[in-house]
Amino acid sequence: MSNLFEPISLGKSTIKNRFFLAPLTNTQSYADGRLSDDEYQWLTMRAKGGFAMTMTCAAHVQAVGQGFPGQLGIFSDDHLEGLTRLASGIKAENSLSIVQLHHAGMRTPGELINDRPVCPSDHSETGSRGLSTKEVEQLAEDFITAAQRAEAAGFEGVELHGAHGYILCQFLSPTINQRSDQYGGSLENRSRILMDIIAGIRERCSPDFVLGVRLSPERFDVKLAEILELSQQLMSAGSIDFLDMSLWNVFKEPAEEEFQGRSLASYFTELDRGATKLGFAGSIRTPAEAQQCLDLNVDFVMLGRAAILHHDFPDQMKNDPQFQPIKNPVSADHLRLEGLGEAFINYMSSWKGFVKD
C-alpha cells in the first residue's frame, strides 16, 4: 500500500506528501485580476494545513480569457506584486507554489469582457468567433509569457488548464475545433498549441521550473481514446513533470460504452508514465477515499471540496488516520473559520447542498 505521507519528486523538486490542492474557482480576486487578502488567506491556510502542493485557481493569461468574476489574473505585470506576495506566503509553509494558467475561450461570459468570446472556430451556440492563425500564435505566446511571469513572481511551477471545456480543451475537441490550418484536423494538429506552449515554457523558464497539464478524459466534446493517446505522448516525451486528470469521480466507469466494464482511472494508470507523475481529481472527500485513490496506482491525489471544508485535511489525517470530515451542508461561519471570504462563501452557496440556508 502506498503511503500518502511519503515524499514525491516533481522534476528536480521533492515535496513532503501526496496531497495536492486542486485549483478551485473562488471569485475572490479584484475585478482587474489583482490578488486580494481573502484569496491570499484561502491559499496560504491550505499550505499551512499540510498540502504539499498549493495551486491557485485558474489564472487567465489574456484579459479576454476571463472565465468568471473575481478571477485571479496573470496577463499583466500589474499582477506581479500580488503574485509575488502569494508565492512567498505559500513557500513559507513548505508547500510547492503552482499557478494554474487558463483561458476560458468560448466559455468566457461576454459581459465580463464587453466583447465576443473567442474559440478555435466560429461557434454559433455561444456566439464565439474563431481565432486567426496569428491570434492562435499570440495565445500560445501569452501562455508562455504568463509562465515566465509566474516564475518571476517566485512561483515554483505552473499547470496548463487543458480540461473542462476551456480553450486548450476546445482545441483538442474534434467537434468544436473545425480549423483547416496547422491547429485543426488531426489530433497532432489539435494538440499543437498545447505542445507549442510546453516547448516554449521549457525553453524560457529555468530547468527546475515544475510544469504540469490538466486534462479531461471525457465530456466537453473530447474523446477518451484521443485523450489516452495524448496523455501517453505527453508522458513519453518527458516534457512535463505531472499529469493531472480531472475525472469528476475517480472510481467511475467511462461514459463511452466501448470502454465500459472497468474503471476510467485504470486506462490511465496502465500507461507508461516514465518520470512523469500522475494524479487524479474527482470526489475524493474522506481519508479512506484519498487512500483508495492512491492505491489505484497514482502518484498524488487532488483535493477540492475536502480542502474547502478543512484547510488542514492532510495534517488532520496524519495526526488521526480515522479523522472524519464534516459533512455538508455546513454553515457560513464554518467556512469563514476555514479561511473563505464572503465572495467565496456566496459562490459555494450556489452549489446545491454545500452551505446551509
What are these regions (language model features)?
Residues M1-D357:
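Flavin-dependent oxidoreductase catalytic cores
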